[in-house]
Regions:
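Structured binding elements
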Residues: 274
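Active-site glycine-rich loop that binds ribose-phosphate moieties when present
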Residues: 259
């Protein structure tokens, strides 16, 4: 019988112990002092009895716990199927997916949602007009969906006109109107009635906090993965997610969906106002973190909405 180290697990250190994590079956196994030599030996297929006699009890223990896998076994077939399907995404992606995959015996728990933490109380604050003050070009949902689907409200080409502060207030109020783990950071470049700079949106007060200076074309393009088209926008809204809603790593999946819902609402509101909006997740996280001033340990950069006036139009969303 030939054995090798499982391809669907990994090693981490915790509380002074070295632990093998089997993410397919959600099991952890503490590795003893002789395990290292055995694992290194079976890094490729080798005969079960090819190790010295003193290591054979370790081999049996590792095999019983699926740290070692027997060639042709059910576990081997399962791993081969996973590797075939997930190989191009690399080991980290499949490890996360299967580690957070729930089973019929999974138990769920939640925590009470705290107040938003990113309120920047010491920053200059600017109250925003309510959504009712903006000039809405489309009020029927079907009309808005038609405009978005036909490219009129979405795209990567923008007109010379900027965005009005009335339109900005309306979009942010619509997008941030529910309890969410998503934070919004508008980078204002050409918004009529608002100083250029980096802001944070306070959903409770419906106001902006000025947290950074004007962002030039080069810095914005670099943060957005060298996509030159973003420089034509009057407004870029970066989305971040706070890890607080759940005590399970599965919450990372939910953070992405949450930001997507917020962006879709903002995009539909933008289309209803006659604006053009686009979304990109091709961002350089590190540059975005520096640009908006967030801590990557607690606040994760997700992507951004890029917003501007329609081609051939003036300032959009005002009276």
């Amino acid at each position: 019988m030939r054995l090798r180290v499982s391809a669907c697990g990994g090693v981490f250190a915790t509380d002074g112990q070295v632990v093998w994590d089997d993410y397919l079956d959600h099991r952890q196994f503490v590795l003893g002092p002789d395990s290292d030599a055995v694992l290194r030996w079976f890094i490729r297929w080798r005969d079960r009895d090819s190790v010295p006699e003193r290591h054979r009890p370790v081999v049996e223990a590792l095999l019983a716990n699926d740290v070692l896998v027997a060639e042709g076994s059910q576990r081997d077939a399962q791993e081969q199927a996973v590797l075939h399907a997930w190989g191009r995404w690399g080991p980290v992606a499949r490890a996360y997916h299967y580690s957070t995959r729930t089973t019929r015996g999974s138990r769920f728990s939640g925590v009470e949602a705290p107040r938003p933490v990113g309120t920047f109380r010491d920053a200059e604050r600017i109250p925003l007009p309510g959504a009712e003050e903006a000039r809405w070009l489309h009020r029927d949902l079907l009309d808005v969906l038609r405009v978005r689907g036909g490219g009129g409200g979405g795209g990567r080409e923008f007109g010379d006109g900027g965005v009005s502060v009335l339109a900005l207030g309306a979009m942010l109020q619509a997008a941030g109107g529910s309890v969410s783990s998503t934070e919004l950071y508008p980078v204002v470049r050409d918004v009529d009635g608002l100083k250029p700079g980096v802001y944070h949106y306070d959903v409770q007060g419906h106001e902006l906090a000025l947290v950074g200076d004007f962002v030039g074309d080069a810095d914005l393009i670099a943060a957005c993965g060298d996509q030159a088209w973003v420089a034509g926008a009057g407004l870029v809204v970066f989305y971040t997610s706070l890890v607080w809603r759940h005590d399970s790593p599965r919450a990372y999946r939910v953070l992405q969906l949450d930001a997507g819902h917020v962006n879709q609402t903002l995009s539909l509101a933008g289309a209803a106002l006659g604006l053009r909006t686009a979304f990109t997740a091709a961002i350089r996280d590190e540059l975005v973190e520096e640009l908006i001033g967030c801590d990557p340990a607690t606040e994760l950069a997700i992507g951004c909405a890029v917003i501007g006036g329609a081609v051939g139009g003036g300032v959009v969303g005002g009276e």
